[in-house]
């Protein structure tokens, strides 16, 4: 069914080309007053549905403005609006997009609700600060390497309590290896005190000490910014219910980069309708918070878990042309990247079935494919818990390996039957031979 009042906006950094029903486009600027004029013009024309390309971040101000005005706004992938070769202009793109939208050929991409977008902005900014702080630690390590100080070879991390205590003392002027080693935690001194003392003997060049001082100041600066982000994130989260449903005590350790928000696990469970997503393997409180910041709490917009995993870029692609079949690799969005990072934490797990699944697949297909497959399983469980309310029950590595063994045995029996043979247990065969 045709919609002659469907509009399309070709978004740019300086101009917005708007066409209604495929008619000659009108051009608007991108300053705030021009965006208000664009909105008023669309409303005066009787437009109720607007589509636009996701061009960088330029579409976000207009999207929020039109959404607040009550219009149906669709953010579409630029691949859907490609014009015929030789007709690439902003005016033509706007008309062609409006024609496609008028015929119902443009599929809306996922855009979270306004409150989730606000949380998303804070979380992404915080992640940028965490990455910048990590680069400061690398600069500290570089300064130590230039001074031939091998502290990072004998302690776990320069950003830990002991590492930072030593760095601050060096910046303050302390040079004695014994005095610096005394600042380390008692566990380190008890196990490898002499190794730490030897690692702290080096050359104290002024330029390298200046690099260390600057890196430490930058580290402290980013820690303050991260703490500011934590306060903003806590402010946009819903208030904590004083009488929440009881949650079983979690034995999972909190990550070093996790936000410092009081009772975050209970708040997340409250947001998700009482579902504790941290029961899923590899999903920490911070991981669940990041996922909610990307996809929100209503995952029913994806009809099935296959739709959700495909949107996240975790489903295997396919491209058939005649007799040729080939997989199509496409980039994973932030949600898919989060699931892949979480999957990596299960690689060395000793008692989780999904860890055994990863190792079995990695031995046969390689680590990259195994990581993607494991991430897809995690994404599927995330969808099922959020939409269907399923409870994840860990079956354990031993039971999983037993299921794999039985599956292999059934496959061998089928193969033996096809070849006209019969499988005989090893103990029975030995007895018959004797």
Annotate the PLM regions.
Residues 1-434:
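A detector of single, family-specific signature residues
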């Amino acid at each position: 069914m045709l919609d002659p009042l469907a509009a399309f906006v070709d978004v740019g950094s300086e101009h917005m080309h708007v066409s209604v029903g495929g008619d000659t486009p009108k051009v608007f600027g991108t300053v705030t007053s021009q965006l208000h004029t664009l909105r008023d013009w669309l409303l005066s024309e009787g437009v109720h549905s607007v589509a636009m390309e996701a061009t960088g971040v330029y579409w976000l101000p207009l999207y929020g403005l039109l959404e607040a005005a009550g219009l149906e706004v669709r953010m579409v992938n630029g691949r859907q609006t490609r014009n015929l070769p030789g007709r690439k202009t902003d005016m033509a793109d706007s008309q062609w997009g409006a024609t496609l939208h008028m015929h119902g050929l443009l599929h809306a991409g996922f855009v979270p609700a306004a409150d989730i977008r606000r949380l998303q902005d804070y979380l992404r900014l915080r992640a940028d600060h965490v990455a910048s702080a990590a680069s400061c630690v690398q600069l500290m390590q570089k300064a130590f390497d230039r001074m031939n100080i091998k502290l990072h070879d004998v302690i776990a991390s320069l950003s830990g309590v002991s590492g930072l205590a030593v760095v601050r003392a060096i910046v303050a002027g302390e040079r004695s290896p014994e005095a610096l080693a005394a600042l380390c935690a008692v566990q380190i001194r008890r196990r490898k005190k002499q190794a730490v003392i030897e690692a702290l003997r080096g050359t104290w060049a002024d330029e390298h000490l200046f690099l260390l001082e600057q890196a430490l100041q930058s580290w402290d600066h980013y820690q303050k910014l991260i703490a500011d982000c934590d306060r903003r994130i806590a402010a946009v989260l819903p208030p904590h219910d004083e009488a929440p449903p009881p949650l079983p005590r979690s034995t999972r350790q909190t990550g070093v980069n996790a936000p410092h928000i009081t009772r975050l696990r209970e708040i997340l469970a409250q947001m998700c309708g009482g579902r504790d997503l941290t029961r899923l393997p590899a999903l920490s409180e911070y991981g669940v918070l990041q996922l909610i910041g990307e996809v929100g709490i209503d995952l029913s917009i994806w009809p099935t878990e296959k739709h959700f995993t495909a949107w996240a870029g975790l489903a295997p692609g396919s491209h058939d042309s005649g007799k040729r079949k080939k997989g199509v690799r496409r980039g994973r969005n932030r949600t898919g990247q989060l699931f892949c990072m979480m999957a990596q934490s299960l690689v060395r797990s000793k008692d989780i079935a999904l860890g055994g699944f990863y190792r079995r697949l990695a031995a046969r297909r390689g680590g990259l494919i195994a990581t993607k497959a494991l991430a897809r399983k995690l994404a599927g469980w995330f969808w099922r818990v959020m939409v269907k309310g399923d409870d994840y029950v860990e079956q354990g590595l031993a039971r999983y390996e037993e299921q794999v063994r039985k599956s292999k045995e059934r496959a061998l029996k089928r193969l033996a039957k096809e070849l006209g043979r019969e499988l005989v247990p090893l103990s029975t065969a030995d007895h018959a031979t004797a």
